[in-house]
Amino acid sequence: LLLSLLLSLTACGKPETQLEKTAGYLQAQVAEPGVGSIGGDWLIFGLARSGIKVPQKYFDTYYNNVEAAVREKNGVLSERKYTEYSRTVLALTAIGKDPASVAGFNLLRPLADFEQVTKQGINGTIFALLALDSGNYEIPENPNAAVQATRQMYVDELLTRELPDGGWTLTGGEADVDITAMTLQALAKYREQPEVEAAVERGLAVLSSLQEPDGGYVSWGSSNSESVAQVIVALTELGVPLDDERFVKNGVTVEDALLRFAQESGAFVHVLDGSGGDDGMATEQAFYALAAIHRAETGKTTLYDMTDVMQ
């Protein structure tokens, strides 16, 4: 199966790109995409945004699995982690499906509950904003919410969580690469607000200073591919060229740094020594970062701006 996928991708005679190679690997590894973080929502999101030709049946299988899961759970994907809704909304939007009507349930409605979304921490806020903005969705009324959310409330929540020296973190007092990059992704659409623009510039300065001499990034003590992938997505969402001098160290760009983690199979590893083997999360994040680069290079809307699908 993998061979046939790769042959079909290279049939045009052009050298296979890393994007094509990884797309083939992912589809071969996950024959039936399910619901969830790995081998599901992010995989579908990445494939749909990559521009790679994917059989419609593959996306249909995913959607049918989402419908079944939503029906089985009576519309409640999680009572605690509202990123479950956000991630599903992003994947559904990417394949042109309406998240407001899935097996009779509106998956946008939970994202209108400000307290429940933010209770999860900064991740909840980041991905609620990305999900709502992905298709320029109106925030529906949520009669069960103690506080009805607005976009500006989520933007302000992110601004209040900025660290004194710039950047953002999940816990503690030092800026975290991944969280800072993801926050910048969510704020990218709001840069016309002076406070947001200033916070974004501080965040970019932090990411530039945290970049290693080899062009990579360290998070939780190890140089890893996921952190590099998130920085790439942040830069492309903000329209910052990947060869911007702030993000080139010793001649190495963030794209160069990411590709160091690529394996011959098309997979990516979490850490450079490959000690964890081919890694599902690392591969999916690297893949959608490559999709973000491809979209920037070909003049398409950004990875998270899915208004092109809505037209």
Give the role of each language-model region.
Residues 1-8:
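Bacterial N-terminal signal peptides
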Residues 12-311:
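Preference for long, amphipathic alpha-helical scaffolds in soluble/luminal domains
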